[in-house]
Amino acid sequence: MKQRFIKYICLSILGEMAISFYILADTFFIAQGIGDKGLTALNLAIPVFNFIYGIGLMLGIGSGIRLSILKIDNKHDEINQVFDHTVLLGLVIGVLFMITGLLYSPSLARLLGANDAVLNDTVTYLRTIMIFTPAFIFNNALNALVRNDNNPALATTAMIVASLMNVVLDYIFIFLCHMGMFGAVFATCLAPIIGLSILSLHFMKKKNTFHPVQLHFQFSIIQRIIKLGFPSMLIEISSGLVVLLFNTLILKITGNIGVAAYGVVCNIWLVCIAIFNGLAHGMQPLTSESYGSHDTKNLIMLRRMTLTISLLLSSVIYLTVFTNASMITSLFNKTNNPTLYKLAIEGFKIMFIGLFFAGVNIVLTTYFTSIESAKIASTLILLRGVVLIVPASIILSQFGMKGIWSSLPLSEIITTCVGIIYLKLKRAMN
């Protein structure tokens, strides 16, 4: 089990980091090719990307958990129906997003806080991302299913190749073809299509557990997928809401340049969070498998190992970011704006304290989801993503940018305390 655990988490971390580089690559190339206004537009549009990404995770993690549990009892017909219902739900949601993007992108951009200076770039990013929603949803969903179907290597390969192609296409479209913001977002949208083409190879594998079959619609299957996957979607949605809230507060304090600085800090934060998502998602198939077979010993071992690794990774990442904050900021500050430079460095040093607790919270949330305790998982996500961060950021914003940066670590610390209490209660019940 330990060897499988190491294999799964290593591959999953690589894959999740690759996905996080979608936006990081955009951030870097937009900073170099378009400038501060482009960074601001990108950060204003990120909440929508989080929402779309979250829906894909909900479908993938929800159906993946069901797949892992159903495999224990060799219920292949039910597994195929879970897959078919996942495709149906993804298609319906994807089409709705496409229509919304085509018709309402300008209104949505205004709602997200875009002013006249950045409106056109924000609309371009939003409209293009939303038109390609089905690709993002199916890529995330199929990736999680393939990983749960004992093929983590293919899932990771798809993510890494797609991410590398995104970087290459970003460079080509922005610097060689001079396509501006559209070039950046178009490169990002082509990446999941590349990922899907690689993931489709799983259907040629003899040991593949799920296949497309004739759909026998059952609302209960959709309900179960959503219930199990909802905590994963909630993580992404809450992340997007935090970005939206911070953007709104920062615009009032320091204007567009403050949002650009937050965009730099936020995108590096998201890459680091992707490491913990990878750690947790690597644990998930094995935890669900142990839960399905009532193997309490393995459940405890997996939880302890994952939490220990989370704390070790947090220490390494924080030390690296703290000592290299100046260099990291310079990579995204082509115009050498002193305000952006100062704000971003301050943000790195304060906000990243929360990384120690964020890692623990992500692991605990995924653990509870894996053992079908979705209510506890959702409670933790709502605490760190809405209930605590919203009042904390609004109140602490009275102290300027230092207050904004401090609100996130505070929320993560309190959530960790609540998560530990839930864990002890769960152990006492069992």
What residue spans do the PLM features occupy?
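Small-residue hotspots at the loop-to-helix junctions and early N-terminal turns
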Residues: 36-47, 122, 126, 185, ...
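Short runs within selected transmembrane alpha-helices of multi-pass transporters and secretion channels
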Residues: 60, 128-147, 155-166, 184-199, ...
